[in-house]
Amino acid sequence: MIFQSFILDNLVFLCMKIINSIVVVGLYYGFLTTFSIGPSYLFLLRARLVEEGTEKKISATTGFITGQLIMFISIYYAPLHLALGRPHIITVIALPYLLFQFFGNNHKNFLNYGYKNPNSIRNFSIQRIFFHNLIFQLLNPFFLPSSILIRLVNIYLFRCNNKFIFLISSFIGWIIGHTFFMKWIEFILVRIQQTNSIKSNVRIQSNKYIMSEFRNSMLKIFLVFLFITCLYYLGRVPPPFFSKKLSEIQETHEIYKKGKKIDVEKNLQRVQTKQKQKRSNNKEGFLSLFSKNENNLYKIDEEKYKLGFVKKPLVNILFNYKRWNRPFRYIKNNRFENVVKNEISEFFFHTCQSDGKERISFMYPPNLSTFHKMMETKFYLFTKDKISYDELSNYWSYTNEEKRNKLSNEFVNRAKVMDKELISLDILENRIRLSNDETKTKYLTKIYDPFLNGRFRGQIENVFSTSIQYEKNEKKNTILINKIHGILISNNTYKKNNSNYPELEKKINIFDRKSLVTTFFFFNLISKFSKKLVSSLSFETLSLFPEHEQVKINYEEEKKQIIKILFDAIRTDLNEKTIVNGNRTKCIRINEIRKKVPRWSYKFIDELEQLEGKNEAENYQIRSRKAKRVVILTNKSKFFKKYDTYNPTGDTDNAEKKKNELALIRYSQQSDFRRDIIKGSIRAQRRKTVTWKFFQKRVHSPLFLDKIEKPLFFSFDSFKSMKIFFMFKIWMRKKEEFEISSYTEERAKESSKKEEEKKKENEERKRIEIAEAWDSIIFAQVIRGILLITQSILRKYILLPSLIITKNIARILFFQFPEWSEDFRDWKREMYIKCTYNGVQLSEREFPKKWLTDGIQIKILFPFRLKPWHKSKLRSNEKKKDLMKKKNFCFLTVWGMEVDLPFSGSPQKNRFSSFFDPIFKELKKKTKQFQFFTFRVLKVLSEKLKLFLTILIEKAKRISKSIIESILKSILKSILSLTKIKQFFKLLFIKFKFKKIDELSENKKDSTIYKNNPMISETTISIQSINSVNCSLKKKKIKDLNAKRKAVIKKIEKIKKGLVISETNIHSNKTTYDSKRVEFEKKKLQILQRRRNARLTRKSHSFFKFFMKRIYRDIFLYISCIPRINIQLFLELTKKFLNKSIYDNEANAERIYKTNQSIIRFISILHKYFHTRNPNSHNSCDISFLSQAYVFFNLLHTRIININIYKLRSVFQYHGIFFFLKNEIKDSFFGAQGIFHYKLKHNNPLNSVRNQWTNWLKDHYYQYDLSKSRWSRLVPQKWRNRITEYRIAQNKDLTKCNSYEKSQLILYKEQQVNALKKKIRKQYRYDLLSYNFINYADKKDSYIYGYRSLFQVKKNQVISSNYNTYKKELFDIIDNLFIKNYISEDAILDMEKNLYRKYFDWMGINREILNRSISNPEFWFFSKFVIFYDAYRGNSQVIPIKLLFFSSNVNQNVSENKKNITRKKKNESLELELETRNRAKAEYPDQRNLESSISNQEKDIENDYVGSDSEKNSKGIKKKKDKNKMEAELNFLLRNFLILHLNWNNFLGQRIFNNVKVYCLLIRLKNLREITIASIQRGELGLDIMMIQNQKNLILLGLRKKKNNKFMKKEIFVIEPVRLSRKNNKQFFMYQTIGLSLIQKNKRKIYHKYPEKIHVNKKNFYKYITRTRDQKITEKKEKDNSDLLVPENILSARRRRELRILICLNPNNINSMHRNTIFYNPNKVQNGFPLLTKKRKYFEKDKKKLMNFKIFLWPKYRLEDLACINRYWFNTHNGSRFSIVRIHMYPRMKIR
């Protein structure tokens, strides 16, 4: 089983090795590249399908494979890659190839003459197929872009070490894949032919030769398809031969100027003769290397400059290979725009020596690599031995050991001298500084001194203005040294022109490697000095490294000669840039040392810069958003001379002649698709973007078209109009019946207004679209401008005169007087003013600039209106009315029409209406008069006809009555024999008949039948007469009949009365049936309404319950979170805060005390509430971040020791440096638990160690004890709720209230001194911190200069966890924590003189507010009060409480009397006044002056606060005062928190724009009176806005109306919040994260460490008692614990760090393993720690000696020192690896 598992493991390992090998990976990637099929496969497939013969198919495949092989080789071979990748080379190959292809396919016997055998290799058709496949494979990257699969090869090639094997294997993989692909295609084709899967269902009968023609035309079809693919790719990348040429930057040659040419040849001859005399025969070959030839060194190509241009190669002239083809942006910095490219990338790869080994660095300095390349090319003659890696590593370790020994010996010697008490200043090592003089009295400035460390390195503080002028001290001996100028001679010129070149080849072996290294060191030394006196250079003392002192004497002469050539032979003068020889007076010109740097070939400007006139380039190259330059004013006045003139041509002479212009830029409203792309480059091909409108603001994706409101092809306007018509009809019907309510009327008015606004918006939009359309069309503005001018000429001189002539001729024909003079007077009044494209008028004869390209408008002033007749002169009132109504201007269109606005779609109708309207009016009048006359005539006629007809009717009635009576008499006589009943009915019928006639003829109302019917009476009379004749016969019967007749008549009268009443009611005012129906409906609605109200009243109880639940859930649940607040107390507080004023100083103090007590009492309630809610969250810091310290501290509190800890005994007994475990934690914890050896165990018991741990945690991890405002920005809320924090009680006397800042200009020198002191103290603190870490174990030996162990328990130390512990905020932290005068005077540490401790730091409140974030719930409510709670509690006697809450502008009382300017000055902002006073007081920090000034300040505050009230005591002024207070608070919040960007385009308003247009016209005219009066009368010129006094009137004209929503919709008024960078205190967080190395002491540490603070002068509390070191020693302190000085300060800061790191390094162990390994075997490193295995006795024996070196150990995990370990000290490069973090360090050492 073991053997099988062994075999399986080996097989798996072998398989993994094979899979990960380069060959297999290359085969895999090569196989993948076959799937990247391009257009090169077209020729191959064509040869397989169409060509006949195996030779042609073989030639196609071989050509294809060779082309692919060349492409693979080009990946590895750089020159071939450049040759195939450059566009002009591809163009040279592609153009002849396409021509050859075209002629070869059109001519069958093209270049095949004389060859009869078609299958021979000499046949050109076979060769042509081969070259087709070969060349097109090379042109594949040109026609189609390389696919991802091909690019994978390039990517992996960079990672691979053995590149050539990878390329071969990938090529083989590609061949395998290609063969599989071709076989698969052949298989498919054969399968198709065998199975006949493609069958033609349609038979071709008309033409049998179509298929043969199709086969013959396959070549042409193929060419067309190839041409389409080429065009497709050319659309993506434009070819270089069709690209647009851009103007390049012209190089300025300053050497050759007019009048400054020097006779170069004469100077050359003199210098050459003198140099030849000094040359020695022995060193002739060597010196000739550094001398330049007569012909080529000093000779300048004058012909190049005589021609005026630099000679360029033909390729650069034909092909612009540097241009932008891709849609790249031209990014530039407007402030610092340079010609040189900033192409230094973030990574630069180069081989370097790191840790004694050669490694690839990706952060290598590019300048250094270029210098190495230059030196390698120039020193190719010297033989250079290759150095092995072992030699390099040994050399590196050897140099480090030597440095360490040298530094340690030097330090020990200095320390020994100090032990002998021979203290002198020479013992202390001074800083190395660069000097300019031998006496070392003058040094370089701190900014330019590289040996100085600190804040001066790399920083230049601009304290004063840059206008300080320094005098130039010209010295005779100061020169600029031309560095290594003789070395950098070009090799080609040297070989060609040097006659001594063959002699030099014999002397190549003179120089060996060491001599070359020494020369290089001298070159590096020389390069450090850019300006130096020649006499001060002494190279004998310059030996920076010890190994370079042992140089052979044989090469000293060579070095001297090299230096002599470098310094004495050729030097560059400062002023004239000439070459000066040391002892000569002649001057020679040479070319300086030059390096070809990446330069911008072009300096582009955008279209906006050209329009603004900033640059003087001829044409722009960057296409910006479409815009036009709108010229508002051109004038030669002095006011406009300060503006830059618009000079697109760049001619200064023409620019001076041109008028000064005041112009604006108008942007197009089209969508910007240019996107700052350079001319000639392609656009970015963006997918998923569609534009379906001609004018579209934004590009939309088709995926979201359903979410966008799209205009359809048809609209529903017709349906809307029909709907409106029907609504109007219904409304009219209802109007007849009942009235419309007022609500509906208002709605109708609003809808009509909206419709009008929509119409205006649509018209404006259409107008803009037309204007943009004219801009978008090519040459449209030229055509339009010419048409407008022709239309104006035709109108003025042809059309209008012809109309005048025809009108007057017509008047003559109608026998009226002609009006020639009146018409021509109006014709002459018409003016044609040329305007810009935007409508700004210039003058009648002045054309705008570039009007053919930019466009033109023609405005017609006082347009001619043809009138049929002219009236007499109107009155003045009528004239004013007409002028106000009419607009006496219009714009001319292309069609000759008149328009109110440019590009308006609706033309005016005034041209013909002015002529025909008066005629139509007169016709209307005449028709009205005629109608009135005819109406009167007809009325009279109608009345007369009515009378005539009535008379005729009456006569006819009378005649008819007589005739009827005679007829009746005859009838009665003839019918006497009939019965009585027949006679009765006949008489009754006649009576009814006549009754109806009488009733129709008479129209009287409310009359009886008898009164209205005289015929009845007559008939009765006639009947009575008849009865009287026959009375004797039938008297009784007639009486009976009369009675019956009367009864019937009465019944008829009753029926008639009902009918008459109904008829009269129709014409009366009483209600009809319809009105009754409407009333019934109203009653019905009222009944329903009553039912609904009753239903609501029934359900009101449940509804009220539901409403109360909602209120409780939404409102009162949130209010319940608010703590219990004393409302009465809060109201009293607000009353006192707002209404009380300051009268005297005593009353002020009483008021302040009361209000402070109330505020503190009020806010203490909030504090208690919130602290009692979460008793566990005493503070807002999270100690769980402590990782190691926190975990071990908790383990220490658990008295039960886990068994697993003993398993780590071997790990923790190792006294080396751990990667993830700090030694202090390990020793303190595990030493206490007894894991170490019993002799090495700590003597303290468990409780004392626990106290030490608590102290250690507080001292070392105080950075987690942040303030609430800062912790809230770092830690979330839930972490803060889980915190228990041990706090230390602080003394309130130690507060820092330094609230007075000092001015930089006055105290500049003091700041410099303070900065130096701070720097020294900071450095001293860091050193002491490192000693505290090293000496943590022993109390007695760890006390170094007054510092005790951080683990030492103190009696006065009090640990408390009370949540009411007063915690200091940001402005209470002590800034300058330092040791003051530590040698001569020892004061209480970290304590400063605080003269202003009684006064509150109110100047820093604004900064505090900005950095505070409301994170705790107590800040949700009354945040203004809680902000200053902790700060104001101990300082409540100086400044009024109002000044705390409003640090800005409390009394901005603006007086109504504007004339009283002095009162305004007195009532300025309080903040500025106090700032100036504080600055004055900072200059004189005297106690008496300070107290008096502060009392005066309080009085001034009172006077300012009460100043406005003392004069006017009315109630209105008090209200204004309260409003001003609230405005001050609002302005304070807005100024500090609200920062907005207003993109307000139309901020001036339409009236001001109209005024501007009129001003532009009036400025150009001489006689202004008539036009100004006319414009004022028309209302175009507003006198009220000609002088704008207040800025608010100018800005907020458009905002006065409530139309903000409208502006937001139109995108005119846009509020965009500015993305403000958060103002974080970077240094604070950096120091907090670094933690251990950069401790910034808090005040509570002062209480721990310095119990001497009790000794304070109580009378003068602002002073503290300073005591010297002797006084402290006499005060019962052990003399052994006080060290006079830290011995490490003997060395300088730089040497100190170097010594620490060299001691920590162990080159022997480091060389045994690689630096990048994280895990290693600790058993191999046991030899490096022999002391740890010895006994404690021996350890205690060497304890005193160890103490001397313990302080020099490099502090653990010092990130500052880690950053300093770089190649400058140990040839270690930090760019590639930061492996120095894993340096092994000695915890303890023994002096050997």
Curated annotation (Swiss-Prot):
Keywords attached to this entry: Chloroplast, Membrane, Plastid, Plastid inner membrane, Protein transport, Transmembrane, Transmembrane helix, Transport
TM stretches of this protein: 18-38, 64-84, 87-107, 129-149, 165-185, 221-241
GO cellular component: chloroplast inner membrane
Recorded topology in the membrane: Multi-pass membrane protein
Protein's GO biological process: protein transport
Main location: plastid
Keyword set includes ATP-binding: no
Pfam families for the chain: Ycf1 (PF05758)
Cellular localisation: Plastid, Chloroplast inner membrane
Domain of life: Eukaryota
Remaining remarks: There is a partial copy of the N-terminus (positions 1-162) of ycf1 in the inverted repeat (ABC25181).
Protein purpose: Involved in protein precursor import into chloroplasts. May be part of an intermediate translocation complex acting as a protein-conducting channel at the inner envelope.
Subunit structure: Part of the Tic complex.
Family: Belongs to the TIC214 family.
Name of the protein in its database record: Protein TIC 214
Organism: Glycine max
Gene of this entry: TIC214
